[in-house]
Design a protein with these regions (language model features):
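Aromatic/hydrophobic pocket-lining residues that form π-stacking "cages" and hydrophobic walls in ligand
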Residues: 29, 139, 173, 189, ...
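C-terminal alpha-helical "lid" subdomain
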Residues: 1-9, 14, 18-24, 31-35, ...
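Walker A/P-loop NTP-binding motif of AAA+ ATPase domains
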Residues: 96-100, 106-271
Length: 376
């Protein structure tokens, strides 16, 4: 049955007198009806909502109907809610990971069809890999593509020093996320999902993992749970099994790096494909976050220093980021020699003496001599 998720949630909310759930899922149903050109039905449901009392109408903003729960001790919110119109993150992934992410999104978008065939929906995704590679941005992308709010757990509030409070907070957060159409995102997941056989951990953490597993198991099939970790080796084996999709978000490949260079230099400088290829060679092995940081710092320094932002600015900031330049150097020639040799060692075919000269603002003859150590 089409719209079975929304109808089921509305009925469930009505039976439990959960008006937040009724309103939020009715709004989602209206949006889907409008997308399918079911204008008459959409208008009918819209009129039902707008005919409610002033109190209910004021609650139609999700944050009023369904306030974000707080930790009972600190009174701080257990999560931040990011709405689709506030979600501006862009993420660039390898083509393989892009396809896997699309598959996960399509699974949810076709939930009605899958449920009608008795197949069920894959609604849990674990993102893992090195820091700065886009795991968090993937969560934002999924929520935006689905047009759903992203509920981002706040670990500083979720984890409590009081016995039993962390497990209680986890349960409260899961209950909150099931009251509305949303994507629940648990970042730095290993903090609450560590292996229970770790002898260095206290019994409290083991109770937390047990609570987490119970809450994941009790999630309805139409809810979405995303989790991310930089330390997948620390996760409890039972936690791994709870995730239908597991996506390793790796360091960007050359193609992804070139796309990042395009994105981060938009409306600033024009780089040729050859120049982008050269930059992607030196950026190899860096995370997307590091590449963004290098380019934005170079841009910032150029603006503050009153100079033009150029590819040389990017290379200069790259050398600083890699920390290959000595703090105490004898001459500018020494610095240029270090930079020239570094680029040459990256790839001799790409970084010819002429290319290095263009990058460093020198001559081909000088660079040749520096690389061959013919200048004292």
């Amino acid at each position: 049955m089409k719209y079975s998720i929304e109808v089921g949630k509305i009925v469930e909310g009505a039976l439990k007198h959960d008006y937040a759930k009724v309103i939020n899922y009715t709004k989602q149903l209206i949006e889907k009806l409008e997308e399918d050109d079911e204008t008459r039905a959409a208008n009918k449901f819209s009129k039902l909502l707008t005919a409610q009392s002033e109190t209910t109408l004021s609650a139609m903003g999700m944050e009023k109907v369904n306030p974000v729960p707080v930790d009972t001790e600190s009174r701080t919110a257990l999560a931040d809610v990011i709405y689709p119109n506030e979600n501006k993150y862009e993420v660039i992934l390898s083509k393989n990971n892009e396809e896997k992410l699309k598959s996960f999104i399509l699974s949810y978008q076709n939930a009605d069809k899958l449920n009608s065939l008795g197949i069920g929906v894959s609604n849990t995704l674990l993102l893992y890999g090195p820091p700065g590679c886009g795991k968090t941005k993937c969560a934002y992308l999924i929520a935006r593509e689905l047009g759903l709010p992203l509920v981002v757990a706040r670990l500083d509030s979720l984890i409590s020093s009081y016995l039993g409070t962390t497990a209680k907070n986890i349960r409260t957060l899961f209950e909150f996320a099931q009251k509305m159409p949303c994507v629940l995102f648990l970042d730095e997941f290993d903090a609450i999902a560590k292996a229970r056989d770790d002898s260095n951990e206290l019994g409290e953490l083991k109770r937390v993992v047990n609570s987490l597993l119970q809450n994941v198991d009790s999630m309805s099939s139409d809810s979405l749970l995303l989790a991310a970790t930089n330390h997948e080796n620390l996760l409890d084996s039972a936690v791994w099994r709870r995730f239908d999709y597991r996506l390793e978000v790796e360091l960007p490949d050359n193609e992804a790096i070139v796309e990042m260079i395009d994105l981060f230099t938009t409306n600033t400088i024009e780089l040729s494909q050859k120049e982008k290829k050269e930059l992607s060679t030196v950026f190899k092995g860096l995370s997307g976050a590091s590449i963004e940081e290098i380019i934005k710092k170079a841009m910032r320094n150029a603006i503050i220093g009153g100079s033009d932002f150029s590819k040389k600015s990017i290379y200069d900031e790259f050398f600083v980021h890699k920390n290959i330049l000595p703090q105490n150097y004898q001459s500018d020639k020494e610095l240029m020699s270090i930079k020239a040799k570094y680029l040459r060692n990256c790839n001799e075919k790409i970084f010819s003496f002429q290319v290095i000269a263009d990058v460093l603002g020198s001559s081909k003859t000088t660079i040749s001599k520096l690389v061959k150590e013919e200048i004292d």
